[in-house]
Design a protein with these regions (language model features):
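Non-catalytic accessory segments flanking enzyme active sites
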Residues: 46-48, 154-156, 163-165, 182-189, ...
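A short glycine-rich, aromatic-capped structural motif
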Residues: 702-747, 751-762, 768, 850
Length: 897
């Protein structure tokens, strides 16, 4: 029996995709976005303003390489002068901070401590700082909490393990009973005293309390209580809502009408009622596909009413209670629309927020005074600016930046963006967010990557977002357009739009996407022969269908996308709810329809190289969907296919290492089949090895064996870009300096040594001469620039020409003094040829951590010596002392026009 290899299986035999796949293609320009940039972003959130209105506590989420995940810390910022204080640190996630009503404490949720199996508990920290302490110690942990009084906190939690659970644990019985409604164990309300640490049970409900909200006066609690273990799957038996009177210890069911299942409760400032969201659908029996509208509940009359929004697209991104009414975000496509709603003399009134930038403003929280707000301003081309503002006369007044995040983005290219519109599948307008190539030139055509959002009821907004799932600036750095499409079925466009694909799945979305690329081709922006498409979740689902219906795409990268709706029905965590809504019933009632809608049965039409991503623990889009997709393409053997699994990951990737691998694999695929710039890395080659360093050094400019380049017949220093500075690759060498100082004498063989024993005025004079000779503007680095460069080389100091190198060990200050007599016996001292040690930067810069210390200019124009020299120990605990001039030199900086 003969065995043959298909094209797809041959591709799989090659290992040229492993690790560092895209790194070979990263341009040396530090302003371009890289995978590292995406992963080093920090994020802010969970803002809570102090009762006095002078402070805000918030959460910064930061990447931790050692933990391989994002970690959340608490911060405190003054609203007056933006003073920033870090309250917590470590390896635990500290989240959901809330001020006590008297402003004395901040409570938060955390599993901090040495026990890796620790559950989430309520922790407290004094508002003036200090060490946090744990308030609760429940065996099953705490779900969420709210302050009731300065001494009382209401929280939701499970009871301690029941005897049934304890017995299973003793037996090491970890079998799972699927759909075990009998053991759908309740989540209840409890109250804990700050002073006494005593816990009191407030409810005996049998359902699971998910969301709850405590009234400002501490008398009332409104709850959502899940009733059925199958509800997330089939959307049948919904949660029930209850109103607790904590003073009278009563509980009353509210919102008892059919289909009423409100959520997102916000109390009025006077505690007389609350607002909430409610799903609205045209289907009287199934509201799985819906939009949200606004209701108001009066606690005195126990009645509720729908608030007339007078806005066809209904609610958008939530709401906040203010002195001027409920500040509400209304659905507005890719933007925001902010309005106040208030009942005056029995009539609801709407007034718009008056701000020229309101469509790009998001209100995160409003203080207890109903006026102080934390807001952010962002567009697809403007990273979020976090501000404090005062609400007065329906304006956001006294806006001021208070929290600065990711300042390094100021030194990065940010792609130009715009909201564009074209005619979609039904002849109606479709919106998209278009990102331009970083080096865009009018009249030229560029590649296009279509990046599709999930949902389907998600939305791509005019906000800045760069993530492992979608990274438009990384692609713009590869000189590509990126288009995000708000296809039929997307959210934030009203009920008609979101419901339009019920019974028409794929039929409108795919044409919307294809017509978007047609529009850009027709405008002369995009090269029709260089199109790619990618997406995660529903974005992957639509990407897969697009390459079935069209052969225009040169590459497709679906992550966590369905191909077989029949198997999805039983394996997806919400399979019945989703599939019944969009496909009109279960597969046993509509088998032919399910097959018709499943891309799996059309895989022979695919002609696009495909890379597939999945987490092994994904239940939103079950992992076996990836296997079915991969096996079909692999067995058909028509196109290259690659399948990447991420162990332990759910629907979204959590580990930083997995996020990195996903992006690097994806970019390598794009570089190969779309951009055609991919170069296979040598898996045996270590860039930091002596061989790697020698190869790097071999690319530097030389003239007659001397470092530098010729300009107007004169040998001058070579400059390269490092962190947006055009800096000398080496310290100015003796032979370079000799071109300026004609009578300079030095020993043969030391031409490439750094010029030493130079004072400040001599270094400045050389820069002036160099400027005259070349017609370019050279100078010494400013002190702040030099410190930035030294910081860049901090991790390199141990391997540079400093005293530790000559001693052969990490030398102490005492030992350095003892070693001086030995050093004086060396005829040429400790200096070596520039570039003798490991550099920093992709376009390498040498000797920032040794050889000679270097002159720079302080803010007063005076000379300052900074940096390590061959005579300097690397000991960071010693106060820096400049070395003798024998070990002082300089390097030049070129000012680019």
């Amino acid at each position: 029996m003969k065995r043959c290899l298909t094209a797809a299986s041959v591709i799989l035999f090659f290992s040229f995709w492993m690790l560092r796949l895209s790194l070979a293609q990263e341009d040396a320009d530090p302003r371009k976005w890289t995978v590292d940039d995406v992963l080093k972003q920090e994020f802010t959130g969970s803002y809570d303003i102090s009762p006095c209105g002078k402070w805000v506590v918030w959460v910064k989420t930061r990447p931790d390489k050692e933990e391989d995940r994002m970690i959340a810390d608490l911060y405190l910022s003054a609203l007056g002068d933006s003073t920033e204080i870090q309250l917590t640190r470590g390896k635990a996630d500290d989240r959901n901070p809330k001020w006590s009503p008297d402003g004395k404490y901040i409570a938060f949720i955390s599993s901090r401590g040495e026990d890796k199996e620790a559950k989430d508990q309520i922790w407290l920290i004094h508002s003036r700082g200090g060490e946090p302490w744990v308030l609760t110690s429940l065996k099953n942990g705490v779900n969420s909490f709210e302050w009731r009084t300065p001494d009382k906190i209401v929280f939701s939690a499970r009871e301690d393990p029941y005897f049934y659970e304890q017995e299973l644990k003793k037996k090491k019985d970890d079998a799972i009973v699927v759909g075990d409604q009998e053991h759908f164990l309740p989540v209840r309300l409890f109250e804990v005293s700050v002073k006494a640490k005593e816990v009191e049970r407030l409810s005996m409900n049998q359902g699971r309390i998910g969301e709850f909200a405590v009234s400002p006066d501490g008398q009332w609690v409104v709850t959502n209580e899940d009733q059925n273990i199958h509800y997330p799957y089939d959307n049948r038996i919904p949660p029930r809502q209850f109103l607790y009177n904590l003073n009278e210890k009563t509980r009353e069911e509210i919102f008892t009408e059919k289909r009423m299942k409100p959520y997102d409760y916000v109390w009025t400032l006077d505690a007389k009622g609350f607002f909430c969201s409610q799903s609205v659908s045209s289907d009287p029996d199934n509201d799985y596909v819906s939009v949200a509208t606004l209701y108001y509940f009066d606690v005195t009359t126990k009645t509720y009413e729908r608030v007339p929004l007078n806005w066809n697209w209904e609610l958008g991104y939530g709401y906040q209670m203010t002195q001027e009414g409920l500040l509400t975000s209304l659905a507005n496509g890719p933007w925001n629309k902010l309005a106040f709603y208030q009942k005056i003399n029995g009539q609801w009134e709407r007034h718009w927020l008056e701000d020229a930038d309101s469509k790009n403003i998001h209100v995160h929280t409003v203080g207890k005074d109903g006026r102080t707000a934390i807001i952010s301003y962002t567009t697809a081309s403007v990273p979020p600016r976090i501000k404090v503002a005062k609400m007065q006369d329906r304006h956001l007044q006294e806006q001021r930046d208070i929290i600065k995040i990711n300042p390094w983005m100021n030194e990065k290219y940010i792609a130009k963006s715009e909201i564009i519109q074209w005619k979609g599948a039904k002849g109606d307008p479709v919106d998209g967010v278009l990102y331009y190539p970083h080096n865009y030139e009018a009249g030229k055509r560029y590649p296009l990557m279509v990046s599709i959002h999930g949902g389907p009821a998600g939305v791509d907004s005019d906000v800045f977002r760069e993530s492992w799932g979608s990274y438009p600036n990384v692609l713009a750095s590869r000189n590509s357009f990126v288009l995000k499409v708000n296809y039929h079925g997307s959210g934030n466009y009203g009920l008609k739009w979101v419901e339009s694909i019920k019974g028409h799945y794929y039929e409108y979305e795919v044409p919307d996407i294809l017509k978007g690329s047609d529009y850009l081709i027709k405008k002369g922006l995009v090269d029709p022969d260089r199109l790619g498409i990618t997406g995660w979740s529903n974005g992957a689902i639509l990407s897969i269908q697009c390459v079935i219906e069209s052969d225009r795409f040169k590459v497709v990268a679906p992550g966590a996308g369905d191909v077989n709706w029949t198997s999805d029905y039983g394996n997806c965590a919400f399979g019945a709810g989703f599939d019944n809504a969009y496909f009109g019933g279960p597969p046993w009632e509509r088998p032919d329809y399910y097959i018709k809608k499943s891309p799996l049965f059309k895989m022979e039409k695919v002609s696009t190289p495909t890379i597939i991503f999945f987490g092994t623990n994904d239940t939103n889009v079950p992992t076996e969907q990836g296997w079915e997709h991969y096996r079909a393409l692999q067995q058909i053997g028509k196109v290259p296919v690659r399948f990447i699994l991420f162990p332990g990951e759910p629907h979204g990737l959590r580990k930083l290492s997995h996020q990195r691998r996903k992006m690097e694999e994806e970019l390598a695929w794009f570089d190969t089949y779309l951009f055609q710039t991919y170069e296979k890395p040598n898996e045996a080659f270590n860039e930091d090895s002596p061989l790697g360093l020698a190869l790097k050094k071999g690319k530097v400019k030389k003239t007659d064996g001397w470092y530098g380049e010729e300009s107007n017949g004169v040998l001058v220093p070579e400059v390269v870009e490092l962190d947006s500075l055009w800096i000398g690759r080496f310290e100015v060498t003796r032979v370079q300096y000799a071109a300026y100082k004609k009578n300079l004498q030095f020993k043969t063989g030391t031409e490439n040594y750094p010029q030493n024993e130079i004072d400040f005025e001599e270094a400045k004079a050389y820069c002036q001469w160099l400027s005259q000779v070349t017609g370019k503007k050279y100078r010494l680095p400013y002190e702040k620039e030099m410190r930035k460069l030294i910081q860049k080389a901090k991790g390199n100091v141990a391997g540079e020409n400093n005293l530790d190198y000559w001693a052969g060990y990490a030398i102490t200050p005492d030992e350095a003094t003892m070693l001086l007599p030995k050093i004086e016996q060396l005829e040429n001292g400790l200096l070596l040829s520039v570039g003798s040690f490991k550099p920093v930067g992709k376009e390498p810069v040498y000797d920032l951590g040794g050889n000679v210390a270097e002159w720079c200019v302080d803010e007063n124009g005076q000379g300052v010596i900074l940096g390590h020299s061959a005579l300097t120990p690397s000991d960071s605990k010693t106060l820096y002392q400049p070395p003798h001039l024998k070990y002082v030199g300089f390097r030049v900086l070129l000012e680019k026009e």
